[in-house]
Amino acid sequence: MKVYSGSDIRNVAVVGHSHCGKTSLISAMLHAAKMTPALGRVADGSAVTAYDDEEVARQTTMANAVAFAEWNGVKVNLVDTPGFHMFVHEARAAMMPVESALVVVNACSGVETMTDRVWKYATEVALPRAIVVNQVDHPKADSRLGRQQMIEMMQQRWGRQVVPIELPIVDDKGFHGVVDLVTMKAYMYQLDGSGRGEAGKIPHALEADSQAAHEALVELVAEGKDELMEEFFREGTIPEDHLITALHEAIREDRIFPVLYTSGLRNVGTDHLLDFLKVYAPAPAEREPIAARATRSTPPAHSNGEAKPGDGYVNEEMVMRRMDDKEPLALYVYKTMSDPFAGKISFFKVVSGVVKNDMTVENFTRHESERLSHLSVMQGRKPAEIQELHAGDLGAVPKLRSTLSGDTLGDRAHEIFLEPVSAPEPVMTYAIEPKSRGDEDKLAPALHKLMEEDSMVRFFRDPQTNEFLVAGSGQTHIEAIVSKLKKRYHTEVTLKAPKVPYRETIRGRAEAQGRHKKQTGGHGQFGDCKIRMEPLPRGSGIVFENDIFGGAIPRQFVPAVEKGIHESAGRGYLAGYPVVDFKVTVFDGSYHDVDSSEMSFKLAARIAFRKCMEQAKPALLEPVMRVEIESPDEFAGALMADLNSRRGRVQGMDTAGTGTVLRAEVPMAEMLNYGTTLTSITQGRGSFRMDMDHYDVVPQHLSEKILATAKKPAGEDGED
């Protein structure tokens, strides 16, 4: 395997909406570069970057995958990304180790919801990008969305910087070539799947369109560049070598978003796309220096292993690190994968320096040493071992002990910490139960391995309901987790809707006496307290106040009263849910010199608490979620109607590109399976996020149903 310098590397994320043909396009590029003996197909599982069993079964990419093509002296690293909304966070993570992106657009559907989202991600990180209109060979491509209409749609969304650098050649043979608007040559394909075009003259029918498009491209490239503008107005054009240099610079600076045309399935235009990446895509060596924190003091202490911004920083000093072989070694781990044969594989970018096989490095995030044995580059799931990798390249290494995604590794003497890409919070949670005792023993280790490779997986125990919960980005995601547990780790589980963490409260004021007295042989038990309970605003918790004067209850027993109140509140009154948002004041009582004790006053407080609850208008509270829903405009009405049916309160509606963002407050009980409904309403083009916002009183008719099915706490505490 050849070793490449940073100037001869192109790192490219391939992003776009689900089913726009990203994986097929990468397979076609690899075949055109003769990296694979045949054209890989997603449908039969032969595509290089679609190797996971779940991905093949569902015919959709669910995690980032890496492949590379060696093309005319450069190495093109391609990061395939999911386009389905449940996994689109992976596309954001894929933008960290690359210098450019190919935004793939379906020739029939045009710009879709996730296309807009990944474009937004790329804009946020100022990532240079080109647009690839794929599946141009589809019979309905031209009739459903003509070429000019497609360009206008993209310009409307993303600005006039969107400009064709190619024109598709479509005639009675179908799509079988492209016109290069820089060199003004046509490239024709035999449609044999080889992906190799032959240069020739532009077809007569496209001469006028090609000339007009060439002039529009030249004018946009020259815009804002005085020397080029003068040359353009003086000569009427710009020499080809000047145009290539200027176009490369314009793409790197996000002043132009060029449009190319391909067919991944028939392998048309892919060799020209590789040529484009070689000539115009930024190399790692051209990247601006990367900002990094100088150091950190302690490793993060989080159960899911995530590095959190701000954890353990010694200071906020920032350093700039150039992507250069001469800089100290630094590696950023952008992906972790669990392989049934190799174990855990860590995918990394060489941010600076040169990494060599069998080198020992420091994990700056966790303050542990790691040995880099079997240094490799990945072709899908297959590693190709290599002796060294230079600044800017992408590599992988198996069996690192402590390293997780988001970690920074490198030369111990030059510690830096690169900010990890934060994952969004999961939006769907299920209770998970092992089917057998053997499954129970294997469940936690298996889920923790899945959490290592997927930042959206969460596994935890609910402290209120005591259930084990698994959380993910949607129904499909959680189903995939369960399938992986069974197939990969031989662990079978049952999914159930999680219990809603209801709470209880009071809406009125009450006073009560709790008197605990028990006489047995020897010392007896005696405790007597009077308390007052009153409601507090939502979110106040429990407030305890001591208003005892004159020693009615000795000072040493007052904490026992408070403890008894807290214990009773934790057990609930109506249905065993914790009681919150109230103030309790102990204002009187009595004691016995011999028989009183902490336990006696704790039991007395429990009795007083239950009496007060009975009189203070107890009520059931439910968690209310803050929900944000993104979808195309045409689904806004149906989504609002659905939210209203779920007792939701719409708080506002905003515009996001050509889509709509709905903001609402909805009870958690109504949102447990919302992901499935949203997919149905929006035809898979919507997404949502939700976070806990506040608790509110459950309507009476629903409260009665909930209480009727809930298990009530048994027995009284103490004696009156």
Where are these regions (language model features)?
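Structural and coupling elements of P-loop NTPases
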Residues: 1-720
